[in-house]
């Protein structure tokens, strides 16, 4: 795997039996003890992920809030200090450049967390729209490591090695300068699994020590390292979208059912606003739906969705769900076929298998919302 980047945790994967793959140009573990075991560990106990491949950027300055609002579809004005917001960044046509988290530290200080596969593109896009805004934009990706600790026991375990009461960090809130095993970190109650949990940002040189400290703290409870395989099945069951599967620059947030994060009534303009207003007024022509495969098989990304011999869309993500123990998926289909209960076929290896549209909220989240 020459020419691939590594995270500050690259040296620990093999200690835990990690199987390494190329993901977004990084050497990362796809699994440790097996993705099914890891999936259930996060659903029932707690699991630790290396997500240091994610990108981070700081935006500061007098116009930081205005600038971020210009880039994002969600309402940045509602964000208070030490809060986190999920949002989309769109192009002029309303297509998704990326989905990301915006952290507001204090005043005019914002921290953006962006997808690894879009890191360079996003930073270039953000810097390219600076214009006359009085802001400073700094790509801080290489100076930050990120761990995600997720699962129903995550708080109980992490509490053993931190100097704050984690119950004070509510869902989509953050706290800076938290001492985790004596190391200064940013901790937020956020995640990508559908479970309660935390994302921990630290200095790269502290990452290995924190990795071992967290797993040691959770040894009795059964905490385990988790690879990319389970990360994807976990987010999929919770109907959390993946850039490149459910979204790209030709797909809008409205088409994938994420209109809640597109605030068309905000006073300020944002990139793609006019196109999204027009699309909402005219009505979407395609829609993201959940489906269950009724025949035996497993749906995969890119498989055709067929109705009465006509291709009406494609599968964006599909798995045999480890939690629900059935073959389910997400598909982007023509709007008239998106109603729950609609039957259609999925073309799996030259065979058309029966499927039915279902609610795409496959798994109810257990995050602490209050």
Swiss-Prot record:
Catalyzed reactions: N(6)-[(R)-S(8)-aminomethyldihydrolipoyl]-L-lysyl-[protein] + (6S)-5,6,7,8-tetrahydrofolate = N(6)-[(R)-dihydrolipoyl]-L-lysyl-[protein] + (6R)-5,10-methylene-5,6,7,8-tetrahydrofolate + NH4(+)
Gene Ontology cellular component annotations, sorted alphabetically: cytosol; glycine cleavage complex
Top-rank taxon: Bacteria
Disulfide cysteine pairs (residue numbers): none
EC number: 2.1.2.10
Any one Gene Ontology molecular-function term assigned to this protein's record: transaminase activity
Gene3D superfamilies attached to this UniProt entry: Aminomethyltransferase beta-barrel domains (3.30.70.1400), Aminomethyltransferase fragment (4.10.1250.10), Probable tRNA modification gtpase trme, domain 1 (3.30.1360.120)
Principal EC category: transferase
GO biological process: glycine decarboxylation via glycine cleavage system
Keywords: Aminotransferase, Transferase
Alphabetized InterPro entries for the sequence: GCS_T, GCS_T_bac, GCST_C, GCV_T_N, GcvT/YgfZ/DmdA, GcvT/YgfZ_C, TrmE/GcvT_dom1
Function field: The glycine cleavage system catalyzes the degradation of glycine.
Family named by the database record: Belongs to the GcvT family.
Matching NCBIfam families: gcvT, PRK00389.1
Assembly with partners or alone: The glycine cleavage system is composed of four proteins: P, T, L and H.
Protein name listed in UniProt: Aminomethyltransferase
Upper lineage: Bacteria, Bacillati, Bacillota, Clostridia, Eubacteriales
């Amino acid at each position: 795997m020459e020419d691939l980047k590594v995270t500050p945790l690259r040296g620990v994967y093999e200690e835990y039996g990690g199987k390494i793959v190329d993901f977004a140009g990084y050497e990362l573990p796809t699994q440790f003890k097996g993705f099914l075991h890891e999936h259930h560990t996060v659903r029932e106990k707690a699991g630790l992920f290396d997500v240091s491949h994610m990108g981070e950027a700081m935006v500061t300055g007098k116009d930081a809030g205005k600038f971020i609002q210009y880039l994002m579809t969600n309402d940045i004005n509602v964000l208070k200090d030490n809060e986190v917001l999920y949002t989309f960044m769109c192009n002029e046509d309303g297509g998704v450049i990326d989905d990301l988290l915006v952290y507001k530290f204090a005043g005019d200080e914002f921290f953006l967390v962006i997808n690894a596969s879009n890191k360079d593109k996003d930073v270039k896009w953000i810097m390219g729209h600076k214009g006359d805004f009085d802001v400073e934009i700094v790509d801080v990706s290489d100076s930050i490591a990120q761990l995600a600790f997720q699962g129903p026991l995550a708080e109980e375990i992490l509490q053993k090695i931190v100097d704050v009461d984690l119950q004070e960090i509510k869902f989509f809130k953050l706290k800076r300068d938290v001492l985790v095993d004596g190391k200064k970190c940013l901790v937020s109650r956020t995640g990508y699994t559908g479970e309660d949990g935390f994302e921990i940002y630290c200095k790269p040189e502290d990452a290995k020590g924190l990795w071992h400290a967290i797993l040691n703290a959770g040894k009795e409870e059964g905490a385990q390292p988790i690879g990319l395989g389970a990360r994807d099945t976990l987010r999929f069951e919770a109907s959390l979208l993946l850039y490149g599967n459910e979204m790209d620059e030709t797909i809008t947030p409205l088409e994938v059912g994420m209109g809640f994060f597109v605030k068309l009534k905000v006073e300020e303009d944002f990139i793609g606003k006019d196109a999204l207003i027009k699309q909402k007024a005219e009505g979407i022509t395609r829609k993201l739906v959940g489906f269950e495969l009724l025949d035996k098989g497993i749906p995969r990304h890119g498989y055709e969705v067929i109705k009465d011999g006509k291709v009406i869309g494609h599968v964006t993500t599909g798995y045999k769900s480890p939690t629900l123990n059935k073959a389910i998926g997400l598909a982007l289909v023509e709007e008239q076929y998106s109603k729950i209960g609609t039957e259609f076929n999925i073309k799996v290896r030259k065979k058309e298998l029966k499927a039915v549209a279902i609610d795409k909220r496959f798994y109810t989240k257990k995050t602490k919302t209050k």
